[in-house]
């Protein structure tokens, strides 16, 4: 044996007998700490507006949210859609500045502004760099107090809305939602009709109608303005009093009570919206659910996540991952001012329509058998551990505060809900589903009805009817 070989063998033996170097242990991941939604400073302005002011250091774009009580049911039946037309025209010129001048002023200040309607309120959203907050609030006040509603702008807004209605009719998801509202709700309630109006009612809207609706229904009293951002060296109270706090209207504001939207007596049925030749089907299933005042409300966002809020939730685990019928179907609770709905929606391959409905029926009925501990933990963790990220920016904080104001909920609601979620058990989730979620479903399918009507009837999930697209 050569000297080199002997040396190599000795070296190999030495290496093989050496003890491995100890590796430092991995750092332990600490449990997430308690999180609470920041509480704003509350101030009442002279004209009846409530101001919620939230200092968010480091957020140099300031978010302002103005929420005024104004339900859609305030619209005359023959002019439904006038509220949305009015809201969309607020930033299209004022009595002091025409549309072009106003646009240039907003652009120079870096202001983003928009307005829209919800079930119970008019909302005006504004975002602006902190240094221009005072000027932006002055313009916001001008916009809500004295919009011009120029005849040409009103005509354009009405035409645009009519075009949107045609486009929505061609969109399967929009068509499905419109049919769901018409089928689910009592035909006498406002919720059964399109929130932004029908083609017939929108076409009837004139400038005089828009002016009259604004004059009668847009008042500061009872409203809320939220200001959130880095407010270092900013005297928000002075800015608000000089702007929105100085806004007054001649007439008294009407007091609006929260009222339920009754369900139709024949809502538990299947409606096939016929679109011949469709290669996929849009599905929507809905039943009754709670509003955010329900004692068990913290359980429902978790249930929505477990059932259909993620790719690994019960619905997609079967219809997407196992069957390959869909790119994704989602579910969630949709609270209203009083009561609410639980909605499942998504699209599937046309040839999988019947089996998808069968599987959804099985999955939804199976929730009554109970939520597993793993599912409960997963849902609770997602909803609670992502909360700090969801509310990390000034605009998200302002949005949530505006929603709380619109719903008349306490400022501690979000923190209380997250804290209650952390304590949820599988038994709590089971009780919430059993006690507060309906068992009779409204089902809408948009697709080629001739391809599966008989098979859908054979499923026995409800009486079946067909309507044209």
PLM region descriptions:
Residues 36-37, 107, 267, 427:
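Residues that act as N-cap/strand-start positions at coil-to-secondary-structure junctions
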Residues 41, 50-55, 212-215, 267-274, ...:
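Short, surface-exposed beta-strand/loop micro-motifs that present aromatic residues
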Residues 63-127, 193-194, 309-325:
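M16/MPP (pitrilysin/insulinase) zinc-metallopeptidase core fold and M16-derived inactive scaffolds
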Residues 2-5, 9-24, 44, 101-255, ...:
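Charge-rich, well-structured scaffold segments of protease-associated domains
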Residues 39, 47-49, 60-66, 120-122, ...:
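Envelope-exposed proteins and targeting segments
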Residues 79, 83, 133, 137, ...:
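Short, charged, low-complexity patches
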Residues 17-62:
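N- or domain-start disorder-to-order transition segments that initiate the globular core
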Residues 54-70, 80, 182, 252-312:
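His/Glu-based metal-binding/catalytic segments typifying zinc-dependent metallopeptidases
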């Amino acid at each position: 044996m050569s000297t080199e070989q002997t040396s190599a063998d000795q070296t190999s033996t030495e290496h093989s007998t050496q003890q491995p170097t100890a590796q430092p242990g991995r750092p332990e991941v600490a449990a997430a700490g308690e999180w609470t939604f920041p509480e704003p400073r509350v101030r009442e302005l002279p004209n009846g507006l409530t101001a919620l002011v939230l200092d968010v250091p480091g957020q140099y774009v300031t978010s302002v949210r103005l929420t005024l009580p104004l339900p859609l049911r305030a619209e005359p039946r023959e002019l439904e859609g006038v509220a949305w037309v009015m809201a969309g025209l607020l930033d299209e010129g004022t009595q002091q500045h025409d549309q072009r001048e106003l646009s240039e002023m907003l652009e120079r200040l870096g202001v983003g502004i928009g307005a829209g309607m919800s079930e119970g309120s008019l909302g005006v959203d504004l975002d602006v760099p902190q240094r221009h907050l005072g000027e932006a609030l002055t313009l916001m006040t001008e916009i809500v107090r004295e919009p011009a509603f120029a005849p040409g702008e009103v005509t354009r807004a009405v035409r645009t809305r009519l075009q949107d209605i045609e486009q929505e009719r061609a969109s399967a998801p929009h068509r499905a939602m419109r049919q769901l509202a018409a089928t689910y709700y009592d035909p006498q309630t406002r919720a059964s009709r399109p929130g932004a109006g029908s083609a017939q009612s929108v076409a009837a809207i004139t400038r005089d109608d828009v002016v009259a609706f604004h004059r009668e229904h847009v008042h500061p009293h009872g409203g809320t303005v939220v200001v959130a951002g880095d407010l270092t060296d900013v005297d928000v109270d002075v800015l608000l009093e000089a702007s929105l706090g100085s806004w007054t209207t001649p007439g008294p504001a009407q007091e609006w009570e929260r009222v339920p939207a009754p369900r139709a007596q024949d809502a538990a049925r299947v409606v096939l919206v016929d679109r011949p030749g469709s290669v996929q089907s849009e599905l929507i299933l809905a039943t009754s659910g709670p509003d955010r005042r329900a004692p068990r409300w913290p359980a429902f966002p978790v249930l929505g996540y477990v059932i259909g809020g993620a790719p690994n939730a019960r619905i997609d685990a079967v219809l997407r991952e196992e069957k390959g019928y869909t790119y994704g179907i989602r579910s969630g609770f949709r609270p209203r001012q009083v009561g609410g709905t639980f909605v499942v929606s998504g699209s599937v391959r046309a040839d999988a329509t019947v089996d998808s409905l069968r599987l959804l029926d099985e999955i939804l009925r199976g929730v009554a058998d109970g939520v597993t501990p793993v599912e409960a933990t997963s849902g609770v963790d997602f909803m609670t551990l992502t909360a700090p990220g969801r509310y990390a920016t000034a605009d998200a904080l302002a949005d949530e505060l505006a929603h709380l104001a619109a719903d008349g909920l306490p400022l501690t609601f979000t923190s209380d809900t997250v804290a209650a979620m952390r304590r949820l058990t599988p038994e709590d989730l089971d009780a919430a589903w059993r006690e507060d979620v309906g068992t009779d479903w409204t089902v809408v399918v948009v697709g080629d009805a001739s391809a599966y009507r008989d098979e859908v009837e054979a499923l026995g999930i409800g009486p079946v009817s067909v309507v044209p697209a």
